[in-house]
Amino acid sequence: MMDALLKAGYRPEIERAVQQCLASQDLADHETGAVTAEAAAEHGSATAVEDGKRFRLFELSANCIDLNDRQVEVLLAMRQPNVVLFGNLLCDWECDALIESSRPKLTPSRVVNADKGTYELKRDVRTSSGAFFQRGETPLVAAIESRLSRLLGVAESRGEPLQILHYPPGAEYRPHYDFFDPARPGNQRVLSMGGQRVGTLIIYLNDVKAGGSTVFPKIGLDILPKKGCGLFFSYADDAGGLDYQTLHGGSPVVAGEKWIATKWLRLGDYLARSD
């Protein structure tokens, strides 16, 4: 596994984080901290999190996935939480084109207010800027969304708009969960747009000089940004409950800047509301 990471261009420093993560795997299997399917059902989320089992890509036996337009490498796969690191997901010019096309559209990033269901600025939590591309908005976006659909086996209609995020020096995203707590009243609005989120794919669009890793603090794993690579994780544990080990964040950029593309997947077809 480490040979594959090094071949893909990852620095040797990542070995320590990966080995620490793997060493703690047995403990994590027994002490997940995740809610059970029965507990999730009390809030109407059992069906949503059970769907996450479909994304357990660690079951793939191949180290390389043929998507017709390119060969995508599997560099790292974890069972619980379900985390997969892909190499060669995007080529350099695709990464560069996404960055340049997003620049005129960038606005300060917002977070969902779980009590009101509104999107609000919260600079003490998230200090990036971002831009959204609707499904098929450009030929490049359409080609990338088609590739991601083939990779994950998920219909394009279940994906939220592709989001491009820019993190200048010092910018970060504090640890958080991507799924919505159905017990919070404001989340009913966002859940009505396609159901629960079941998976996240982060694509690194540039190499970062220092900092800017994707960190999973509960399992001691840092993924360092590498241009063209993609990080996928889903939120269901083996029992079909929400896996709280998927707590993650974007560590502060120390030097240089960080660009990523994010695709969130829903239980059903995603349809944004206009109100």
Question: Where are each of the predicted segments found?
Answer:
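Fe(II)/2-oxoglutarate oxygenase catalytic core
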Residues: D3-F232, A236-D275
